[in-house]
Design a protein with these regions (language model features):
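Conserved flavin/dinucleotide-binding core of flavoenzymes
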Residues: 55, 107, 155, 174-305
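Active-site/ligand-binding neighborhood in enzyme catalytic cores
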Residues: 2-97, 107, 125, 129, ...
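Active-site rim elements
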Residues: 7-15, 66-74, 145-150, 202-211, ...
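Short glycine/proline- and charge-enriched loop/turn segments
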Residues: 60-66, 138-145, 250-254
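Short, glycine/charged-enriched secondary-structure capping and boundary segments
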Residues: 88, 107-108, 132, 136-140, ...
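Central helical "cap/lid" subdomain
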Residues: 96-97, 102-105, 111-169
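A structural signal for well-ordered alpha-helical scaffolds and beta->alpha junctions
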Residues: 14-22, 35, 74-81, 153-157, ...
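Short catalytic/ligand-binding loop motif for oxyanion handling, primarily in non-cytosolic enzymes
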Residues: 45-50, 80, 102, 130-134, ...
């Protein structure tokens, strides 16, 4: 599979980004087993049905099928945000959601819990669905809103299951059920006594019946990994769609996206600067994209001064 994916890179680079992944793979791999694995890997990683995806997903690392080590954050991804916040102290206001951002030529007003904050500039780094319906004035221009609407919206879930007996590191993909699972080391260097699973795309989540609980997924995991001693009673299912502050997983440029959409999506609206993984172009869907978008927004604010 890795060799097949490598062999496709030149053709994918030359192909139009509007060509869908299924159309491209049918032309080059037909209905081979390798094509099915690539479909599954792309759909899971992008958390979207493969017919929404551009053949250019074969060029990125998010849907890679190449064997390589994967870095993890000791203590969880939230540690990055907490570490970045340390130097800001009490200037960060937690549990204080903004309800409106109104800007004019000279300043910006942010409404927060019945009070207002006046600023020279604002960076909005909120999930795409919230941004699209936020009370923002001036509003999002039509061309920018259209580019946002063309983005792929990912839907994903995770299942974490404790292990009754230790297991070595592993990573296994279930092609037909569209999920993969892994065991991995933590910051101590020891393998966690937990198997983690991730599934992406609405069809996959429907097939695993995540809205009714973890039972269907647990059965699929048992069938895929009979070598693991699962403690099903401790299983934890988490779904991005059910988080009101997220409403979906992450986004990316898909087959419907047009050249230049990434610049349009991240363009500032007067004194309001837009950040977040959804503005990061080829880095969309990744924490790396979120971080890069923050640096880009900071540069815009400084340039504005």
């Amino acid at each position: 599979v890795a060799e097949a994916a490598r062999s496709l890179r030149p053709a994918a680079e030359a192909a139009d980004s509007g060509r869908t992944l299924p159309d491209f793979l049918r032309a080059h791999l037909h209905d081979s087993p390798a094509a099915e694995v690539i479909y599954a890997r792309a759909a899971i990683s992008w958390a979207a049905a493969e017919d929404e995806l551009s053949c250019h997903v074969l060029l990125d690392s998010l849907a890679s099928v190449q064997p390589m080590p994967t870095a993890r954050i000791g203590g969880g991804n939230l540690c990055i945000a907490r570490a970045l916040a340390v130097g800001l102290g009490d200037r960060i206001r937690l549990e204080s959601p903004a309800s409106a951002v109104h800007a004019d030529d000279d300043s910006v007003r942010v409404d927060v819990h019945g009070t207002s904050i006046d600023a020279d500039a604002v960076v909005m780094a909120i999930p795409l669905p919230h941004l699209e319906r936020f009370d923002l004035r001036p509003g999002i221009p039509g061309s920018q809103r259209d580019a946002m609407a063309r983005m792929v919206r990912g839907h994903a879930a995770k299942l974490h299951v404790p292990l009754a007996t230790p297991a070595p590191t592993s990573a296994v993909l279930d092609v037909s059920r569209r999920f993969w699972c892994w065991t991995a080391t933590d910051a101590s260097g020891q393998v966690q006594p937990v198997v983690h699973s991730f599934s992406g795309s609405s069809p996959a989540l429907d097939g695993l019946k995540v809205t009714t609980g973890p039972e269907e997924w647990l059965e699929a995991l048992r069938a895929l990994r009979p070598d693991l001693d699962l403690n099903a009673e401790g299983a934890l299912l988490s779904t991005w769609d059910d988080d009101p502050w997220a409403t979906f997983a992450y986004s990316g440029l898909g087959a419907a996206s047009r050249p230049g959409d990434d610049q349009i999506i991240g363009a500032p609206i007067g004194r309001v600067h837009i950040a977040g993984e959804h503005t990061a172009g080829e880095w969309s869907g990744l924490m790396e994209g979120a971080l890069r978008s923050g640096l880009r927004a900071a540069e815009e604010v400084h340039a504005q001064d």
